[in-house]
Amino acid sequence: MLRTHNAGDIRASHIGQEITLAGWVARRRDHGGVAFIDLRDASGSVQVVISDEKVAGELRAEWCVLVTGTVIKRPAGNENSSIPTGEIEVDCSKLEVLSEAAPLPFPVDSGDTANISEEVRLKYRYLHLRREAPARNLSLRSQVT
């Protein structure tokens, strides 16, 4: 078993626990010595804090990674009430790249599909279905039927 929890299921009640998550790198942000990634799986996403610049600098969007770390409360003022995992973050102690991704034909984390032709979306359907709206539609369809 790779993971102990799903990314979207982590809450404040998990603070202090060491967990292992597996998922895709949705976004990476570097802030002088510390990097933040949004780790996404089918259940949602969670912010991961990486102190090792060398490791974080190599990560790219849609790389599949395995992260082990401790759930901590976000510093005051950095909470994000618009997402369920906005109170917490995972302080990474170990990161393993499971699979690298080729350069993407379009951004997966953006909701804007106006600049992406239908032909490209169909050709790369496996990427298109990772986007929030199509994934939500499939989930709803699965629940209804």
Question: Over which residues does each language-model region extend?
Answer:
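Class II aminoacyl-tRNA synthetase catalytic cores and aaRS-like
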Residues: 1-145
